[in-house]
Amino acid sequence: MKVLNLGSKKQASFYVACELYKEMAFNQHCKLGLATGGTMTDLYEQLVKLLNKNQLNVDNVSTFNLDEYVGLTASHPQSYHYYMDDMLFKQYPYFNRKNIHIPNGDAYDMNAEASTYNDVLEQQGQRDIQILGIGENGHIGFNEPGTPFDSVTHIVDLTESTIKANSRYFENEDDVPKQAISMGLANILQAKRIILLAFGEKKRAAITHLLNQEISVDVPATLLHKHPNVEIYLDDEACPKNVAKIHVDEMD
């Protein structure tokens, strides 16, 4: 597991955007696992700049999002469908829509939708890169504490802490969905390479637990210790004291 403090959200996001760009440039049929939320905004902004500058052919790139709120239509401003369109797919409108995969949070039968999305993941095979954030309680995707390590795509009852943390995106806390559909922990670990981003002081405790705690369902992110190719990029605020700071221009 590689852990680096790149100083700022902007610097870390730029570095990871370059990693995604290189993957798409050198592997035109690559499969990318994508994440959403406030952590990822600079990442997509930087990636869009790189794509637009170089007019990269992404017609054969496939994307797979981690999760979606249950009960929100794709057109809802707080849905992750809307987020991805707003942050990436409309900003660089050359991705093939048939290769964009995001769980449907407004399906009639959500358990059937979870099964269908899991089938898609299994049929498409390993993602080349999986992008992750981390919740303040150590969740990855929407896999809350207590989620079995062998879980696949499923419906999640969100914890009070997650609902409260996400309430800043809604008019009031009562508007935050109480459930989500999420890739399971087993799905996440199927990726060839995992890149986790964490920014801000509120994420420091979760990162400290991830790095120092034994693998436990109480902190789902600790399962990443079982994966052979994990990279964690932090800013100063999220970084535990024992992780040295490095500048992007010092990296290979």
Curated annotation (Swiss-Prot):
Q: Which GO terms describe its cellular component?
A: cytoplasm
* Keywords for this protein: Carbohydrate metabolism, Hydrolase
Record Gene3D superfamilies: 3.40.50.1360
Q: What is its EC number?
A: 3.5.99.6
Q: Which domain of life is it from?
A: Bacteria
Q: In which pathway does it act?
A: Amino-sugar metabolism; N-acetylneuraminate degradation; D-fructose 6-phosphate from N-acetylneuraminate: step 5/5
Check the record and name the InterPro entries matching this protein: Glc/Gal-6P_isomerase (IPR006148), Glucosamine6P_isomerase (IPR004547), Glucosamine6P_isomerase_CS (IPR018321), NagB/RpiA_transferase-like (IPR037171)
Q: Known PANTHER family for this protein? A: GLUCOSAMINE-6-PHOSPHATE ISOMERASE
Q: What does this protein do?
A: Catalyzes the reversible isomerization-deamination of glucosamine 6-phosphate (GlcN6P) to form fructose 6-phosphate (Fru6P) and ammonium ion.
UniProt-recorded name of the protein = Glucosamine-6-phosphate deaminase
Q: Which organism is it from?
A: Staphylococcus aureus (strain MRSA252)
